[in-house]
């Protein structure tokens, strides 16, 4: 089963943000979208989940998005937004329960607590969401998404996580916790699409990388094929070098000097 988007274009006002982008991700894999600020990463993710209207075709698990009922999509995919702010005075538990409202597990009282435990927030259920730090709010939102989709597979179909910069507000320990959760979800047969800024975390966890620049695709493929010195240096406008850890040949990205 796959996610497939073909010739996606999107404009806001008179400004074109995405230009004929084709994107593919498969269930059982973690696909990362990377690129510099303003390259169209988050806009592409929003187009993939139909949060923003776009030209082109998008299919999920073999069906066009428009052929799904809203409740079907809610049970198959969870979306973690970049901004975690909520204007209402919810408790943490109430926020996580929002993820259950549209699905078959709406009355499941156990799932929200299990989801909070997975993101290291046991004991936070009764706390005010607005009083949490940005990183804690980000983890609460991930718990909401996990409660919504449940397991990586449902009735023989893969479920999907769409994560917009899921570790941007987190310390290194919780970055690894969140990426481990995403990796485990993919290893369990689900699909994960994540907008990432950290190229080293991308190299550690991703199976597939899609590089964006100027609203267009600059490369797509495996970590080894896509994360190259030349491509990254051109896309990011600075001198980047790819190295490998001797013990296991894992790829890492090492910045050199900024371009003059």
UniProtKB/Swiss-Prot annotation:
It comes from the Bacteria. CDD domains: ABC_Iron-Siderophores_B12_Hemin (cd03214). The keyword Cell membrane applies. Its main location: membrane. One of its GO terms (cellular component) is plasma membrane. Pfam families: ABC_tran. ATP binds at residues 35-42. Its EC number is 7.6.2.-. Belongs to the ABC transporter superfamily. Heme (hemin) importer (TC 3.A.1.14.5) family. Part of the ABC transporter complex HmuTUV involved in hemin import. Responsible for energy coupling to the transport system. The complex is composed of two ATP-binding proteins (HmuV), two transmembrane proteins (HmuU) and a solute-binding protein (HmuT). This is Hemin import ATP-binding protein HmuV. It comes from Ruegeria sp. (strain TM1040) (Silicibacter sp.). The gene is hmuV.
